[in-house]
A protein has these predicted regions:
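Membrane-interface helix-loop junctions in multi-pass transporters/channels
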Residues: 1-146
Length: 146
């Protein structure tokens, strides 16, 4: 039998594993974003949809950080999934589009809402995860004792 393919060897480099985790997470995040974008487009939601995606992604990454996720979970779900799911570039383009259409008040409200709600989402996710993690640990400990 021939030599085993480098991809099938059990001793993959940590960098290759990390890259795979980011790619897998990004694939999931991009597909989730595409699904949300398709649903929002059919409902004519416009920039509200992008703001919603950014807030949800911020909530998720805040929860990940608050739960004390390990480095590999952070790569897969934080860098990968949340990075692909949220969309700063579309937010920026939507803002420019509103400004060039001379909808200054709407542009200002959009920028303010996106930033404040996203930061609030990250803070809420972080706080809730910090509060829930010890409770889950106690429940798991109680379940294992019985």
């Amino acid at each position: 039998m021939g030599a085993m393919s480098p991809l099938l060897q059990p001793n993959l480099s940590p960098q290759l594993v990390d890259c795979g985790l980011v790619c897998a997470g990004a694939c999931g995040g991009a597909l989730a974003r595409y699904g949300a974008h398709t649903a929002a487009k059919s409902r004519n939601m416009g920039p509200v949809a992008i703001c919603t995606l950014n807030v949800l992604g911020s909530l998720a990454i805040g929860g990940l950080a608050g739960a004390g996720a390990g480095p590999r979970a952070s790569l897969a779900f934080g860098t990968g999934f949340c990075g692909a799911f949220t969309t700063f570039s579309t937010f920026a383009l939507d803002s420019v589009t509103l400004i060039t259409a001379e909808k200054y008040a709407l542009a200002a409200a959009y920028v303010l809402a996106n930033n404040c709600l996203s930061i609030g989402g990250a803070a809420a996710g972080f706080t809730v995860a910090r509060k829930v993690k010890p409770l889950l640990g106690r429940l798991a400990g109680a379940g294992g004792a019985g």
